[in-house]
Structure formats: C-alpha cells, structure tokens
C-alpha cells in the first residue's frame, strides 16, 4: 500500500493500518522492572529529530522518507514539542472561527452537497503547513527478535508514517494514541523512521476547540517490544452490589501472539491480602465473571482506595513473559428514580473545573510535573472533579486521578463549533458531524478510542461525547456506542440543548453552559426529567467568580442539581522574552499578530499560565469547601 495525500480531504479515511485501540495498561518483564517503573519492553524515541518545515503540501520534500534521501539541510526539533513554538510559523489563538476563515473559502465535505467531497481542500491547501520528521535509531537489545509496535501518544493533526522507506500507516485524531506494527520492516540497526505531519485535514472540522492552534508531534513516541504471548487488551468492570457493601469482579482478557502457556492472576487489597487467585491456560479471549468480594472498600474522592490486580503471563515452559499490574477501585454511579446522581448510594456533588493541558513554555506538550502540580492544586482548593476539555488527556493524568480521587468527565476529541455558529448566530447548514453519513464513522471512531484506551480507570464517572458540536444522528450514534459498551458510567453531552427533540436519545443528564442561577432554578422547580449540571460556568476571565455563591446555594435546595465545572482551570498564554523590556512576559491571543483573534479570551483560568493562582481561587476554595 502507498500513502495517498488525498486522504486529507476525505472524512471517511481517518486511520490506515492502525492497530485496534486497546486498554492503556503497562506491561513489564518482571517484578523488578515494575518496582523500578522501567519496562525493558519500551524504548523511547523522544529527543532530537531531524526536521523540515514546509509552508504548504506543494512545497514539502515528497520523498524524504526514502533511505537514500539527502536530509543534510534539515534542521533539528525536539520531540515532543509544538512546531509553532520552535518559531517556524505564527502562533495563533482562536475560539470559534476556523483559522483559514477570511483567507480561504472551505466547507466540510458533503455538508452542503452529498456529491461534493471537497477534493483538494486540504491536500492542496496553501495554508496547510507540513512538518517532515526523521529519526534514526537502533533497537535496544531487549526488543531485538520481538514484534515491534510504535505508539504515538499525540500528533496534531494528521500524520503519515514510514519505516525504512516502507509506508506504515496514516492517522488523524490529535489527542488519542496511534499504534502501528513495525515488525515487517524493522531492523536491528540503523532504522529510518519518517513522519509527515499536516496541520489541517478533514479532522480540522472536528477539532475546532477554543485554544491555540498548534501542530506537530507534541506527545511522547515509543517503541513497544511485544512478548511471544502478550496481553493486548483487558476490560475490567468491577461492580458494587445492590447492598453497597460487596464487590463483583468482572474481567475480559484478549491475548495476541502464540497465545500459548498460562497466566496467574491475583487481586490484592492495600495491605497485601489476596482476595482472588486464578491460574488458567491462555486462550485468545478469557473471561472471569461475577467473582464476589465481600465488604469491599469503596472508592471516592475522600478515600480513593485502590485494589491491586496482577497478571503474570507464562510460556509453555513456565518462563515469565510479562507482568501486568493495574490498580482499580469499586464504585457505583447511577441516577435514582428521583433524578439524583448517586455515587456509592450517596448524592454526588461535582466541584469541578474544565482543564486544558497547558504549559506556558511548552504549550500542550505538558510534563508529569505539570500534572502533579495540578492535582495538588485541586486538592488544596477543594476541587474534586475535572472535565478533560475538550479532548482525551495524556495517559498518566487518568492514573493520577484514580490515585487521588478526582472524578473525571472523559471527553472525546470533538468540537465543530465553527460549523454551526457564525458571528454569534446559530446557523447549522453545514454542521458536521450532524447527520451526514460520510462523517459518522469518524466520530464513532473517536468515541471508540476514548473508551477503549481509558475504560479501566475508576476515576472516570462520565463519558462526554464532545463539546459544542450541535446534534444530529451521528451524535446519537456516539451516545449509543457508549451505552452499548459501558453500563457502569453515565454519558454527557451539552450540545443537544440546540436540538431539544433529541434529548431522549442523547445524554443521561441535562447539561448547560453559563445558565444563570434563576434559570437553573426554573428547571429544577419543574419536575426535571434528568439531573442537572453546568458543564461550563463561572467564566473565569478577568476579575471574576464573584457570583459563585448563587450557584452553590442551589445545591442545598435541589438534590437534582449536582454541580458543575468552572471554565476554566489555567490560562492559555505563552511565556516569551520581550526584547524591549528584557523581561519574560505572558502573551495571549492577539499578541502574535494573529488575526482573526479572540484576544485575551485565552485567559479564562483560575491560574495564570505559569500556574500562579489568581484571586478567584480563594472563592473556589471557600465555596467548593462547603460541599466537600
């Protein structure tokens, strides 16, 4: 198979040769590696890569992936990073509009005409910048002789991959992992990996989030050595019985490779006591159903108690091939007949924030230090929940939320705001995904990868279909996907407020943005058909949060109201050196000669971009502390 640049224009092509999405569990060679938190089955490709920037697809070096290509004039760039922050092209912040509006006329393929697939819209787009990446590497000794996969944890926005001159695959969706099999083309020494990253594709219509518009390989890249028999996926569904005391353990395992030998499974409590032990022969698919644990310790924000699952995989000679450790909790979220959201049988109150991934120097290429700082800030200020606005976050974030009792609304990478709202008016004539058949599989795929990757994380209480994408048959299909795959969580989507006739088919909860307290109360006083929340409220721009108490009072009056997520947690601003003053300063939208611009609308956080809390954080700490 050869790469085809026209895939950029086709909403029905979004992944080529990509391995099926699977759970994000780690795997180690043995217990010693687990203790050191270093797996010899993983080889990082982070660091300096050779790089060439092109202003558009026509100017890109088309054969750069060939082994005999002369790349001596290429620059170098760190991976992970944003291309724009290496000064190759302009930084641009924008809220609703698409970056090309006012310069290039585009409409989503098939949106206005079922026969118009907008050929050349992006593949020949004069504004579609291209990053050509090259990386030479030798396999680590632990990977030699094994099947080898490569995992890109995040690439904005569309990428083609080659190894040693051979086309490997294509992927869109900037914020979920993309994994490919390199085995047919891998060498022990002197491998040449080539990645071509386009800033725009049909995925751009689905990734119109309120943020700086970056591109590049902005999350980690690693090689994975696959043992002869390997646990590729596990689906863990611990349930809480109706007495809210006992736990029911359910697990599905999917093995690949030789699928021979046996596995040893253990479940232990925090004191090391074994609650379950099994030894079974390996088959492609194994199920463990309805194992009852009496008087389990329930997981919640105040007491994030996690049990330890250990799976040891052995070959036919009883040699240990891999160890899979995973922590999980028992918790139960549901809606009562009175339309009250309950966690473990008790009323749930969300003291939440929306959180973009952000670092003032690195953009969305954040670090583990950023994440742990944010978790600590949550706990210091009585924030118990986070909405991953408006895309899946880095994998370690979900583990931190499990461990620290942070309730997660896990949102898909979907926002098509500019396709249905123009100049402040609702005008959905070219809305995607809408009900357009050619866009259906692309958005279901985004739901699938979000689910499959993060399905085992106890902290996730809600799946969110996306943000500000209007509503139609394709949003309904996403809702149905989650309901058919997961009955242990609730589904959320706010955008259906614009299509109230679809509310019975989309979202388990009534969700609004910035609805004034009086309007919230009107809903709650009129026999609400669903529990109510504000997925965005208390817009924290400038001197704000002064009216927060009016919302918090409603929590005491109406149990059907279960709180909301403040917009938002951290400013999106970049720390740059000012040549005139000689100081490092934070710059916002519009400060980079970027037009159009929503200017300081990028600064809506409870914290400045350098993670200094704003005065409004005091209000949050006080009011969220009233309902811990």
Swiss-Prot record:
Enzyme class, one word? hydrolase
Q: Is Transmembrane one of the keywords UniProt gives this record?
A: no
Task: Report which superkingdom the organism of origin falls in.
Answer: Bacteria
The active site is formed by 468 (proton donor), 536 (nucleophile)
Cysteines joined through disulfide linkages:
none
**GO-annotated biological processes:** lactose catabolic process
- Which reactions fall under this protein's catalytic activity? Hydrolysis of terminal non-reducing beta-D-galactose residues in beta-D-galactosides
Which molecular-function annotation in GO is an example for this chain?
beta-galactosidase activity
Question: What PROSITE patterns has UniProt attached to this entry?
Answer: GLYCOSYL_HYDROL_F2_1, GLYCOSYL_HYDROL_F2_2
Family from the record? Belongs to the glycosyl hydrolase 2 family.
Q: How does it assemble?
A: Heterodimer of a large (LacL) and a small subunit (LacM).
Protein name, please?
A: Beta-galactosidase large subunit
Which source organism does the UniProt entry give? Answer: Lactobacillus helveticus
